[in-house]
Amino acid sequence: MSELTHVRADGSAHMVDVTGKNETSRTAVAEGFVKMRGDVVKQLFSAGLPKGDALPVARIAGIMGAKKTPDIIPLCHPLPLGKITVDFFELTDGVRIEASVKTRGVTGVEMEALTAVSTAALTVYDMIKAVDKMAVIDGIRVLSKTGGKSGDWSVQ
């Protein structure tokens, strides 16, 4: 079983030392869902919400979220992010959000991909809550990662 890298033997948290690691190309893809009524899905994808066109706003929020990850998640290293994409896929009962993040660095970008999805999902929720108070954010997870000492990984 792997040990937690952010916790010392005495239980105290610390930022992992990555200064001795080699830079490699790294990517991570994450997804999440915002479940909502079908009529709200139609409003969301036709830019018909009372608050306006939510998807472009949520895309920018997701990109900003990825860039701000080390500011809001303790112990995350600041990374030079080379590429961030946030995409939305229409479902009958909501939207699937997928974020992809890429860097050339000494640590992975899974947290940045998760933060991009989370921030985009929160923004969608904020913009639909007036018309669907029962909306739910769900299923946020990493789908894949590449690069680094531990190698490539995918849910498939």
From Swiss-Prot:
Protein name listed in UniProt: Cyclic pyranopterin monophosphate synthase
One GO biological process term: Mo-molybdopterin cofactor biosynthetic process
Gene name, Swiss-Prot/TrEMBL: moaC
Enzyme class: lyase
The keyword Zinc is assigned to this record: no
GO molecular function: cyclic pyranopterin monophosphate synthase activity
InterPro entries: MoaC (IPR023045), MoaC_bact/euk (IPR047594), MoaC_sf (IPR036522), MoCo_biosynth_MoaA/MoaC (IPR050105), Mopterin_CF_biosynth-C_dom (IPR002820)
UniProt keyword annotation of Ribonucleoprotein present: no
Source organism (scientific name): Corynebacterium glutamicum (strain ATCC 13032 / DSM 20300 / JCM 1318 / BCRC 11384 / CCUG 27702 / LMG 3730 / NBRC 12168 / NCIMB 10025 / NRRL B-2784 / 534)
Protein residues bound to substrate: 75-77, 111-112
